[in-house]
Amino acid sequence: MKTSVRLVLAAGALAAAASVAQAQCISKAGKGTGGSDDSAKFQAWEAVLQGTDWSSWASWMASSQTVGQAPGYKVSNLKSRCSAGGWLGRECVVGAKLCKD
């Protein structure tokens, strides 16, 4: 009986650890508009960061302001798609996977 309880507890701990590891990463996308692709991507990346972590967004605004960078996160699978549209002429969607450092 003790062995069964230990196995159940160990399995539960492993499952919890796995879910915590997965919770460290998130895939997000944002949409932005601007007069150029660069400005629309900037707005879209802001939306990604604001939807992920406000403190990362604040650090980003105070530092690089480079699309694809996120203070405190490793960014991968960065993709963007832009087209004519939006209030200012160009509309972009930017998406990425962000994993907490």
Residue map of PLM features:
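Short, well-ordered alpha-helical segments
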Residues: 27-67
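Bacterial N-terminal signal peptides that target proteins for export
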Residues: 1-9
